[in-house]
């Protein structure tokens, strides 16, 4: 696959932007961020984040701002919900290309670094998914690039400006996802400058970065404190200390969690990884930029591995430098006429596709592990075509691997194009309730009261009906903090209180209760509904208004 100056923009357009609107929003993450920004736009409150009309202090404000601006530009669409993540990923790729050009003065290495980055499975998955990680990764990439460039010798004015710019990037990262955006640069840069014996320079100019970051964040930080004095207490202790270090941390996982997840995320370039890391380690003493890139990959990975709370999205900042190391190693191997790593990579992609095909066959033929039901024959066929295509793209490289090895970039793109049509109905109802809500839009819009027993379902209801006043039934979930305020007490209904609450609510009109049930479909002891609509694990109970 020949690289041209239009390859990256075309790749980004075809595989990032065009598919954004094709699949429903995933619950709970995408619905949550869609609804928070929709409420921000509709209420005009750009200071205090609200979710389902409740105070929601899980993240700072900048990510919501970008999502809200996207909705103002593109409307209440799935494209708008995901656009900020995709745009941030595209900008990160451009930054990688530019930085690689500065380091190596080699256009091929630079463009390959951008292509590899955009086609990494983890980057594509997060970059087309509405979470804040792609945005904070952009700011971290900008911070790390700016610091490396200003560490070089230059005029005092240039260094001062560079450190101020570094601080602004860190400040934007902080406004997007909090203190973690300050921790990542520190854990990479401090050991690096100590190793380079340049700590005095960092101590001299570092305060400039701290000042610029503080000045950027201060207006909103002060404004939200004046509006909600408890914001910073909750955000710091609960969302940072408990999430990452406490014994009851969210998303607890073992130390080695990121090893298999990171390797999987490196597809479709996994075969090039050992050689790239080995070459980087060998060149660390003669190549300061290689040492910097290695530190940028390894130290954040170790930091997040030590933390008790783990999510795959946390390690996204490690993949920009990894893409650059992979690209540099690949070009050097081609110059030396070495094809082994490319053949291994082609075989790995081919085998990965075949393994996924085998797993699909087991899921289709084994009743005890059935995922695809009788109504899912079309979806199963699409899924098999996807992984057959992945395998084919791997194996066809073997005939002329030195010319065809970049075809690996297309492997995840087959998945990207076909995924919306490859999902079984059970998964759609469980994780993409948007379609069920759309199918029952008339009933829901005619209801004066809407309830849900799951926060993800509630956010889907709010987004689908453009109403934020969804009642939480029998489960507080992640909005338990917002529900603890006196002005939000009536937003939660217990199962024992529901009959009395329902009798009163029906005086004002129809009531709709959306439930996510267990596999047996049981809704528990509830008043009999006038209408019951069931699809797999989703049950909609409709109570007509009292006459």
UniProtKB/Swiss-Prot annotation:
It is an enzyme of class 2 (transferase). One of its GO terms (molecular function) is mannosyltransferase activity. Keywords: Cell inner membrane, Cell membrane, Glycosyltransferase, Lipid A biosynthesis, Lipid biosynthesis, Lipid metabolism, Lipopolysaccharide biosynthesis, Membrane, Transferase, Transmembrane, Transmembrane helix. Its EC number is 2.4.2.43. GO terms for biological process: lipid A biosynthetic process; lipopolysaccharide biosynthetic process; protein O-linked glycosylation; response to iron(III) ion. One of its GO terms (cellular component) is plasma membrane. The chain crosses the membrane at residues 1-21, 83-103, 111-131, 174-194, 205-225, 253-273, 286-306, 311-331, 346-366, 378-398, 408-428. Pathway: Lipopolysaccharide metabolism; 4-amino-4-deoxy-beta-L-arabinose-lipid A biosynthesis. Disulfide bonds: none annotated. InterPro entries: ArnT_tfrase, Glyco_trans_39/83, LipidA_mod_glycosyltrf_83. It is a multi-pass membrane protein. It is found in: Cell inner membrane. It catalyses: 4-amino-4-deoxy-alpha-L-arabinopyranosyl di-trans,octa-cis-undecaprenyl phosphate + lipid IVA = lipid IIA + di-trans,octa-cis-undecaprenyl phosphate. Belongs to the glycosyltransferase 83 family. Catalyzes the transfer of the L-Ara4N moiety of the glycolipid undecaprenyl phosphate-alpha-L-Ara4N to lipid A. The modified arabinose is attached to lipid A and is required for resistance to polymyxin and cationic antimicrobial peptides. This is Undecaprenyl phosphate-alpha-4-amino-4-deoxy-L-arabinose arabinosyl transferase. It comes from Aeromonas salmonicida (strain A449).
